[in-house]
Amino acid sequence: YTLFESRLSGSLDFFIRDGKDVIGDYKVPLPPYLHESIVANVGTTTSKGFEFQANWDAVRTEDFSYSTNVMLSYTTSKLKSFSNEKYQLGFIEGEGFPSPGNPGSAQRLQDDTPIGSFYGFRYAGVDDAGNILIWKGGEIGGDTKLGSDGDEKDKVYLDGTGVPKWELSWGNTFTYKNFDLSLFFRGRFGYKVMNQYEMYYGLQVVAGDNKLSSAYEENAHIKGPKVICDYFLQNGNYLRLDNITVGWTPKLNTKWIS
């Protein structure tokens, strides 16, 4: 679209994208196969959303001008299937967290679930000794148990994913006589992060570690070991100034150049 004598322009696009041939590692029988697993292109995905772009020459005077441009996108993606008639795969665990403690993985990719889904225990507080409690079977308001005793039956898909739904880029350009200033902002919204720093350095349990102040402040009630649960799942939203450019264009005597 173009409006106001081309001072405002942009576009709005909607999309649905289907992907196929996603690579997976599948178990196969011995024989006839030579190895117990095989890599195959089987998985399918789907994404949908929109992209909005706008450019606006907001101010035009003899000495001063201001223009801005913005791009905003919204996307949701999910894995449709990891299997077909020949190869079957229920899910794939994400990369596990490292030592010390080796608490396991915080993400799982499974049929008909959003890409980037978090999978783990639901936090239910702490016991008298400060050990993390979880909801048994992931049912909030039900029975609780020690997080260290949790098993696969207690894990559920947690709220939010690690993939941003919204992405924003916003550029601004100011000019005054021979000077110009450009500011570029970038942001991502609608996603979660598993705060690994809080899990490893924000708890008091390991003596001698260089800890965050949060170990003795907001996390002071936790005295036991770390457990992958939604207590450490936090909003990842951010908007930051990504780049600043300042320029000066001197007036040159063209006679000198010639």
Question: Could you say what each language-model-derived stretch is?
Answer:
Residues 46-50, 64, 164-168, 233, ...:
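Residues that define the transmembrane beta-barrel architecture of outer-membrane proteins
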Residues 5, 18-22, 34-36, 60, ...:
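Gram-negative outer-membrane beta-barrel proteins
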Residues 1-3, 8-16, 50-58, 66-74, ...:
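Membrane-embedded beta-strands that build the outer-membrane beta-barrel scaffold
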Residues 117, 130, 186-258:
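Extracytoplasmic gating/loop element in the C-terminal half of outer-membrane beta-barrel translocons
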Residues 11-58, 155-158:
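Outer membrane beta-barrel strand-and-loop segments of large Gram-negative receptors
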